[in-house]
Amino acid sequence: MTERKSYSSNKFLLELPYLIEVQKASYDHFLQANLQPNKRLNAGLERVFRDKFPMQDAKGLNVLKYEGYFFGIPKYTITECRERGLTYAVDLWANLTLQVFEEDGEERRLKEEIKNEVRICELPQMTENGSFIINGAERVVVSQLHRSPGVSFDETIMPNGRSDYKSRIIPLRGAWVEFNTDGDMLYLVIDRKKKMPATVMLRCIGFETTNDILALFYKDTETVNIKESDINEYIGRIVFDDVIDEESGDILVYANQTLDEKLCEVLNAAGAQKIVLLSKDAEENHILIHNTLKADKCKSREDALNAIYSTMHQSQEAAPNMATAEAYFKSLFLEDPQKYDLGEVGRYRLNAKVYTKAFEDRLKELNLQKPSLDTMTMSHADFLAIIDYMVGLYNGSSGFSLDDIDHLGNRRIRSVGELLANQLSIGLTRMQRVIVEHLSLKNEDENQTPRELFNTRMVSTVVQSFFGSSQLSQFMDQMNPLSELTHKRRLSALGPGGLTRDRAGFEVRDVHYTHYGRLCPIETPEGPNIGLISSLTIFSKINDLGFIETPYRTVRDGKVDMSVEGLKFLSAEEEENKIIAQATTPMDEDGNFVVDKVKAR
């Protein structure tokens, strides 16, 4: 056997990995073909089916259920497909059950149950080499490097030198939510609709009154006895709580009003006993919330829910009733994973970013809790945490940081399995609309089977279109074995949901310090795609969340740990607080550095 020679200054401390694992592992995880239907994880193809089923009519009298999928056998071999210009694929089948109910008073009774094995589509199979044979040609699906779901915080310096901050919540599916400062105001924008004061969201999640909102951000207050003090000395201060006339029950001064001469006269004339004001320090630190509340025309939770309802429907009319407005708000963000889904990555990043130790302690006082990593929708605590973070950024408080969108902690890989799952989801969504319509129009005496309801062509068209014409599905580079291997490890920032050449600026194309050990800083095409097409380094790998990890050796007391335990794979986010030395630093065979000073970052 030929011995491999190494001319590097330091010996390899790690065996070369399986270089096309990025393709093979992703597709295997998507198919889960070797697992029994009841043992499959809620991921890939299984997750697509679970998300779309059951399908039913409006009354719930006809229900189409999913009970697992299986694959057929390829009709032709890889060689036959190449020679005859065919696609190397297998049929995807699903076990579907149509349950027909009949109304029995207020209850519903099962009338009949029809089970069928239904052909969903023809699914191209990956070869042992990590490629696909489509119409006789060998193709590769390039992995996509895209902006990760979750929350991000940005800063814009205005021409007058003022800093405006923006937070953006990006879900996998659902409405985008933005909170941004404009001067001394904090605004909420949902799905690029009309902006509204951010305190509208606080009222919607249960902090209904102005005093409730002030209590969230202003801890230091001062109670003034009006009878014993000259109230005029406090002109210009902000009122913390409503002052109520004890005799009539009328509100003399509202919370968040700024005390002036006119209000002082009203208090003295009514014989008010005391007034609670914000301390001077609190006023200076939280002017953002004070100004936002002043602009907020909503005075109750009902007003706030109606404001969101009318804004999203782009009308001046309120919801027909409170129940409709509340149900709409909950389905928009809180309770319906079909309409709003952060995804595992989005939830992980949101929890890691905004739930500081101090904020978690505050949540306990409010009887709220940090959502678990299984929670895919937004929660009341999430909205409060993001608004609190925005206030911290505005005030310049310590512990609050901005995000770098080019940092690899904010960008993740969508490999072939995830890309194909997204396409199948689109196809099944189209099919779902047709099936629900058929079920709604179905007569009681009409005996339809699941096979008759399902139109295979609608899903097949989406899959064929993806492999045949998607920007990420490319003819494999077969100049030589090395170029073939390189093509399978290539990453693209282009494609659906990614960047376009025209709007990709210099920063996103440039080499970033987090690329070290993860992306090759040299291998990128010249021309309009420069910096947008890149390649994985040899030892980098992609973790379960889609972030790129690279191996490091731990160093203790100036000695490199050469053991298996000393090897750590770290993502860009995990290495942030670590000191990283260059891999080319000279050392002896035992792992001791042979120089006194080491370059590190």
Describe each model-derived feature in a short phrase:
Residues 523, 534-537:
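Active-site proximal loops enriched in glycine and acidic residues that flank catalytic Cys/His/Asp
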Residues 1-492, 537-601:
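N-terminal non-catalytic structural scaffold regions of very large proteins
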Residues 114, 490-521:
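Flexible, glycine/threonine-enriched loop-and-boundary segments that flank and lead into catalytic domains
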Residues 243, 521-522:
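Hydrophobic beta-strand positions
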